[in-house]
Structures are given as C-alpha cells and as structure tokens.
C-alpha cells in the first residue's frame, strides 16, 4: 500500500474525501453515488490490513481497493455516543447523547440535523439494518428498517445480507444503507454459523499490546475477540457480494468503521488509545486503491468530520457550526 500524508484535520474522512469530483468517478456521473455504511461493534483496528494477527480477507480486500485510515478516532468510547457523533457530526456534549440509549440517554432534540434527514432531503432512499442505539429514534426517519434489536445472541445472521439485498433491489433512486453488526460485542461467542471455521484459542495469540501485560486470561479474551472479528469479516463479505450481485457496486461508496475500541482491558469505556481508536476504510469507484492516510489532527475526530463532508459532496446542504466544518 502507498501512504498518503496530509496536514488536514483528523478526519478528512467519512464519506467523500475527494469532494464533488467523486461524482465524475462513478459509472454514471449524472447519478448521485449510493452509500453503504458498515458499522461493526466494540472493535478497534484489530484487522489483518492494520497488521493484526487475524484473518479478515474481505476487509483486507476492501482496503486494497480503497483507502485505509490510520488515525481515525471517536470522541467517546461508548456505542450510543459514537454513533450519534457519526450521524450528527457533533460532539456528545453538543448533541446531548452523552450516555447509552439503553439507559435512556438521548440527544437534546429530535430536530438536530443528521445524515439521514440531510440525505432524505437530497432525494436519497435511506435504510438501516441492525440497531440504531440513539435517542430519540424519531430523529432518524429511515425509509427502511430491519433487525432493530442489538442481537447480541447473533441469531439469524444471514438476515443482514438478505435484508440488504431486498433494500437495494427496491431502491430505484440513490440510496444510503447503514448496516450495523453485533460482533464484536460481548458476550464473545466462539462460533456462529460455523464461523470462524478455525477458531483461535489463548494458546494461539498474545494479548493485544495496549493491554500492557500478557496473562493467560487476557490471551484467551484476545482469542475470543479475534474470533468475533473473523466472523464479522465473513458477514461483511456476504454483504459486499450482495452489492456486487445487484449491479450497483460501481455506483456505490462503501465505508467501513468500528464504533469504538474492544471491550477489553484499557479499551471500551476508556480514553486510552484502545478505547477511542477505530478502523476506517473507504472504497469509492474510480479511485486508486491501496492508499493509506495518516491525518494530523488539529481538533475534531473522525466522527465530527463525517457529516459536513458527505452532505456537501452529495449535493445536500452543508451543515454549519459542526466541529471541523
């Protein structure tokens, strides 16, 4: 992979780093690009393409076809807080989602502008598969909804790709589809649907370096976590195959991101690197693959920079008063 260095703030990120020029790179420049936004849960950049000793061939291939971001961070290592930041472009203290929706925390108002409202106003059909985990839910008027539960038991995982196929087939206009997977949230489950085919044990791995110590229990937790990452990679592969089979892949920007770090020592719920550093890969049609980006932060996180950039590129109104805008 080649390395692109930039002095831009930390997330020249999410959706369309290339600006309006992206439109000329899809197969039909008169069409707005579709957006497939993939979110996995409770995982940092412990993925093969980031150098972790775990087999994630589908995400590795996506990175080889697009851009891998080395310094992507969220403003808070909690599910609801980071997801609200992704969709509003605001810090938790600015949008009000300072705690988990499970505990009845929510945004200050359902009127806060967000990605879903912005893209709907720009003529996009919007859909979500998997949990939203932000309050109030009414603030996000998705046209299509499926599997609204957290699904930590990992039941009927094939339904994620099946519902995606249904949504994409029904979308004659440009679409925004957000797919939220339950892995790698606890409880760590060794295998689901016989995935991974060859699960790891604590004897196969070392503890993740940011833990600071290597203990048999931490090595086992690391193995359990890696098994979740191998499994979610397989499900993401199924999802990308659905997109390819639809014939719309060449007109679709694909974004993959984790919501925050792993639920491990010095990870989730903390402000350590293991809690707030996330993986982020963007693949968009017609651009050179195999790129890596190391953004130098001058304030703001990946989550903040997301919304101002994508709404501008897609022809929707550009949000004002957002961090990094």
What is the meaning of each model-derived region?
Residues 2, 7, 21-325:
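Formylglycine-dependent sulfatase
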């Amino acid at each position: 992979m080649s390395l692109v260095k930039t002095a831009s703030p930390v997330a020249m990120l999410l959706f369309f780093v290339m600006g309006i020029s992206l439109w000329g790179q899809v197969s039909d420049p008169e069409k707005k690009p579709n957006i497939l936004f993939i979110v996995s849960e409770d995982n940092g950049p412990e993925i093969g393409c980031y150098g972790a000793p775990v087999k994630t061939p589908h995400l590795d291939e996506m990175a080889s076809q697009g851009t891998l971001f080395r310094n992507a961070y969220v403003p808070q290592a909690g599910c609801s807080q980071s997801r609200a930041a992704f969709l509003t472009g605001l810090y938790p203290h600015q949008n009000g989602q300072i705690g988990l929706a499970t505990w009845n925390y929510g945004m200050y108002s359902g009127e806060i502008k967000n990605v879903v409202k912005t893209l709907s106003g720009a003529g996009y059909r919007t859909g979500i598969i998997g949990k939203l985990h932000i309050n109030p839910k009414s603030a996000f008027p998705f046209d299509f909804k499926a599997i609204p539960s957290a699904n930590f038991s990992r039941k009927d995982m094939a339904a994620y790709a099946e519902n995606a196929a249904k949504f994409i087939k029904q979308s004659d206009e440009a679409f925004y589809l957000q797919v939220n997977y339950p892995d790698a949230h606890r409880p760590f489950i060794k295998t689901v649907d016989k995935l991974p085919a060859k699960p790891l044990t604590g004897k196969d791995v070392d503890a993740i370096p940011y833990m600071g110590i290597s203990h048999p229990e931490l090595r086992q937790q690391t193995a359990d976590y890696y098994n979740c990452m191998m499994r979610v990679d397989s499900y993401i592969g199924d999802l990308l195959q659905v997109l390819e089979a639809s014939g719309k892949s060449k007109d679709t920007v694909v974004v993959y991101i984790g919501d925050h770090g792993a639920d491990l020592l010095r990870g989730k719920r903390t402000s350590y690197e293991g809690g707030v550093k996330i993986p982020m890969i963007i693949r968009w049609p017609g651009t050179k693959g195999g790129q890596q980006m190391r953004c130098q932060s001058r304030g703001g996180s990946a989550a903040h920079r997301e919304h101002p950039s994508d709404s501008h590129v897609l022809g929707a109104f550009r949000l004002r008063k957002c961090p990094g805008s």
